[in-house]
Amino acid sequence: MTASLHIILDTDPGIDDAAAIAAALFAPQLDLQLITTVAGNVSVEKTTRNALQLLHFWNSDIPLAQGAATPLLRPLRDAAYVHGESGMEGYDFVDHQRQPLAKPAFIAIRDVLMNAPEPMTLVAIGPLTNIALLLMHYPECACNIRRLVLMGGSAGRGNFTPNAEFNIAVDPEAAALVFRSGLEIVMCGLDVTNQAMLSPDFLNKLPALNRTGKMLHSLFNHYRSGSMRTGVRMHDLCAIAWLVRPELFTLQSCFVAVETQGEYTAGTTVVDIEGRLGQPANAQVALALDVDGFRQWVAEVFAYVP
């Protein structure tokens, strides 16, 4: 199958990011042009190191640029308590000499977009700091963005605070800017990613697939205590799945605002499902997932990975 969708992936690996990067690299429908890193699950130095380790593991020459070390206006609150101090605890990667590009992520994204023959798809599976910096410094790039597909937000409960999902809560100001930007946005939030559970039986079959399966199995063992007994939610992988199998998702056009001021609600995505605010829709929000179809797709895409 010929790759037809050219993408840029902005990520903060992170254990579940590793599975999403694998899918972005090896799904035959996708052509990954650039990876950029951002502070989120752990510091940007660690997310960059982790992404380079993964590229070395797969012997990939995809260029990688290091991005923002802190949110736009706030100190970083990471998720090392979930992913481990390094961000990818549980597997011993081979040493390498790879380095990121000399330019920061938002400039690297600009360069790829402006040199592309047609608009490209951005995929963001971490905080939206790099995307906001791109739009702040180079607003003309918006014309070269086909759409932004993001993992983040929620129409209901959060997973970082009672109301806020982690990726949005880390940098609410960046997310607010992005949702106000006029970009075509597909939001894969907790409403679908909490459904994207891989069963213990599926996880235990990973080592027999290939070396990537062995690596992911080791990482998932450290994702959360007991996760191999209860299953693992593949939050970030949902954004990649939508690119390849959009029919698995039920979307609704909604107005989405990001709360930046609330003492208890900062980082909340206000998803106006019923149109009560009278604002025009600015996002396609994924609200339901064909779970069986998602699991079948995951099994198929992992079979492409070496």
UniProtKB/Swiss-Prot annotation:
The active site is at 235. Keywords: Glycosidase, Hydrolase. Its EC number is 3.2.-.-. One of its GO terms (biological process) is pyrimidine nucleobase metabolic process. It is an enzyme of class 3 (hydrolase). One of its GO terms (molecular function) is purine nucleosidase activity. InterPro entries: Inosine/uridine_hydrolase_dom, IUNH, Nucleosid_hydro_RihC_nonspecif, Ribo_hydro-like. One of its GO terms (cellular component) is cytosol. Hydrolyzes both purine and pyrimidine ribonucleosides with a broad-substrate specificity. Belongs to the IUNH family. RihC subfamily. This is Non-specific ribonucleoside hydrolase RihC. It comes from Salmonella typhi.
